[in-house]
Amino acid sequence: MVAQNSRRELLAASLILTLALIRLTEANSEGDALHALRRSLSDPDNVVQSWDPTLVNPCTWFHVTCNQHHQVTRLDLGNSNLSGHLVPELGKLEHLQYLELYKNEIQGTIPSELGNLKSLISLDLYNNNLTGKIPSSLGKLKSLVFLRLNENRLTGPIPRELTVISSLKVVDVSGNDLCGTIPVEGPFEHIPMQNFENNLRLEGPELLGLASYDTNCT
């Protein structure tokens, strides 16, 4: 009986240690992803100065929120006077729910890897200098509610993959250089037209069966 109890205690201790190691590995991976973002940014106001890669747990860093399992769920860097570009490593933050990087001077493209953020609820990248196309991979974000990409320099069509996100309530892509037609399917049926304004080559709303969505879009 004593030996049996000892084996149970050893098994329980082993399980606890395994879970702790898994969480430590996750924290390291998320910390590496955030540090990659820090390296890509110019930060004159030292907003991300606390993002020290020698600290194992990124939950101690300013502007980073974690859940009870020490997994990164929110990144708040809106209106922080940041410039630079986004990095594909952000796609490793699989528990992230809110990515807030609005009102900065961030340039370059939106990484397609953001489509891996399966828990994402809000993607706020408005008022930056982002270029390139809206990644079709964002259509994989099945929990997304808010998508605000307005006031950038994005080009190309609005990806039709976004029309299958049933949770999507707010889409704003105004003030870009998008082309093609405005979708009317799925959640886009209820998006106000002003959220598509100031895209000189964007036409719509789309006439289903009559107009190609990439009309006038090269």
From Swiss-Prot:
Lineage: Eukaryota, Viridiplantae, Streptophyta, Embryophyta, Tracheophyta
Keyword list, A-Z: Leucine-rich repeat, Plant defense, Repeat, Signal
LRR repeat residue numbers: 69-93, 94-117, 119-141, 142-165, 167-190
Protein role: Probably involved in plant defense response.
Protein name: Leucine-rich repeat protein 2
Keyword Transcription regulation tagged: no
UniProt source species: Arabidopsis thaliana
GO biological processes: defense response
InterPro entries on file: LRR_dom_sf, LRR_N_plant-typ, LRR_R13L4/SHOC2-like
Keyword Signal: yes
Pfam families, alphabetized: LRR_14, LRRNT_2
Gene: LRR2
TM helices/strands, residue ranges: none
Signal peptide residue numbers: 1-27
